[in-house]
Amino acid sequence: MRLNTLSPAAGSKSAAKRVGRGIGSGTGKTCGRGHKGQKSRSGGGVRIGFEGGQMPLKIRLPKFGFTSRKAMVSAEVRISELAKVNGDVVDLSTLKDANLVTRNIQFAKIVLSGTIERPVTVKGLKVTKGARAAIEAAGGKIEE
């Protein structure tokens, strides 16, 4: 072992650099902030997206789109999740009881993702073509 081969242990963390502790430390006096200016001051700095008073890009570009209110009360349920439903009938209330959708959901759609082993009867839910084929192949049925 020699002095030039010594190194910190693997995974160890070096101590935080202490600023304002003299010229020899490398971060004395101005503490790495330079001279004057907004960024050198306490609490200095500009908000995200600020462009120095120029009209920001976010405001220069036109508005577009909207948030569908129906999307907030709609949900998709995977076909593999239907195994968590107790009983043979799957409707909105049984999906809520099985915690597959939240209480505020009013519309649900069953999509093909995964597999289903047992036959179930789907009532009052939308079903994709692939999910419909998989449910019927497992011996289940869909009632509108």
From Swiss-Prot:
Tell me what this protein is called: Large ribosomal subunit protein uL15
The Gene Ontology biological process annotation of the record reads: translation
| Originating gene | rplO
* Gene source species: Shewanella woodyi (strain ATCC 51908 / MS32)
Q: Which family does it belong to?
A: Belongs to the universal ribosomal protein uL15 family.
What PROSITE patterns does its record include? RIBOSOMAL_L15
Give the matching Gene3D superfamilies.
Answer: 3.100.10.10
The UniProt keyword set, sorted, is:
Ribonucleoprotein, Ribosomal protein, RNA-binding, rRNA-binding
UniProt xrefs under InterPro entries: Ribosomal_uL15 (IPR030878), Ribosomal_uL15/eL18 (IPR021131), Ribosomal_uL15/eL18_sf (IPR036227), Ribosomal_uL15_bac-type (IPR005749), Ribosomal_uL15_CS (IPR001196)
Question: Is Disulfide bond set as a keyword in this record?
Answer: no
The record describes its quaternary structure and partners as: Part of the 50S ribosomal subunit.
Q: Which domain of life is it from?
A: Bacteria
* UniProt feature, compositional bias: Gly residues: 21-31
**Function according to Swiss-Prot or TrEMBL:** Binds to the 23S rRNA.
* GO function terms (MF aspect): rRNA binding; structural constituent of ribosome
Q: Name one Pfam family in it.
A: Ribosomal_L27A
Which GO cellular component term is one of those annotated?
Answer: cytosolic large ribosomal subunit
Q: Where is the signal peptide?
A: none
Q: Where is this region: Disordered?
A: 1-48
